[in-house]
Amino acid sequence: MSIICAKVAWLPLTLGTAMGFLITFYLARTLLERNSQPPLALRSWNNMELLPEVGMSHFHLPEDNSVSEELSKKVRVLCWIMTGPTNLKTKAIHVKNSWTRHCNVALFMSSITDEDFPAIGLGTGEGRDKLYWKTIRAFHYAHKYYLNETEWFFKADDDTYVIMDNLRWMLSNYTADQPIYFGKRFKPYIKQGYMSGGAGYVLSREALIRFVEGFRTGVCKHTTSTEDVAIGNCMQLMGVIAGDSRDTEKRETFHPFPPEHHLTMKFSESKSFWYWSYCVYPIVEGPQCCSDLAISFHYISPEDMYTLEYFIYHLRAHGYQYRYQPPLSDNADNLPVYIENETVKPNRTISDFLEPPMES
């Protein structure tokens, strides 16, 4: 009897200990999980739930953006972004919601039309072997519908970030009737070099005219799927100059990697890395790698599209002024001012072309 009573007496203590252990374990696990996860907002960013909804107004009070506004009317840039159906909602949407808002015209070029996005269907397949076909048809599209609406024609990938104001400043030193194009200049394969596809490149109106003429006359052909090399070859054949896009301090403005790679990576530790043998201009590591008026970076994640947008257009250090703000060139003062065209053109498909280049 005493043994039974002893067991009964110990039962509440045992149950209490077990319950206490379970509660402690549950609370500890909950705290660990909570501390191991980023805040809710960041978890939403990682899940791509809030990114398209992020609004980034560029109005600041007080702020003088008169120079930028003036250049946007003198140096009009059409931006076309190479993308695909599977990338519209994962990559292209974040390009659309960030830097392309600073373009005079922004077009998203895909293999098929998406009227909701909207994206222009070029009637090509998908894959790396179709990149040059997309490029050929996209530039033909821009030539047919926008030749007289902008002076410059910029191509970018859907993971490229571009500071359009800096691009306009660089282009303001030139005129659109010059046969020239700019980008991150590589040197293999082509005598005058060619521009990296990932860092983006921009053609003058005259360069675009010559590109289209090259295909009309058969001087330029689709001979390789390597888009940037192929367009560089066509540019050289048509007498289009590979321009120097470095700033007045001889620092690079177009970049084929994200900012942190150029700022922190030691390219010199691996001289076998392809980048060493490709660059026309000397590679500079560290803070001097990049121009204060940098134009583009490649391999930018959706989150970093908005991060860069914030850093460039919103973040300020109190009490500091920009240490490098070059004036506009004399050429920029002589450029005509264009009145904004309110007419919105419908997105067309490749079928609207008159004898577009066809895949062989």
From Swiss-Prot:
Transmembrane annotation, as ranges? 8-28
* Disulphide linkage map: C79-C103, C220-C234, C289-C290
Originating organism = Xenopus laevis
Where does it localize?
A: Membrane
**Quaternary state and interactors:** Homodimer; disulfide-linked.
One GO cellular component term? membrane
The keyword Metal-binding belongs to this UniProt entry's keyword annotation: yes
Q: Please list the residues that bind UDP.
A: M82, E126, G127, R128, K134, D157, H298, Y299
Protein name, entry field: Glycoprotein-N-acetylgalactosamine 3-beta-galactosyltransferase 1
- Segments on the Lumenal face: 29-360
Gene label:
c1galt1
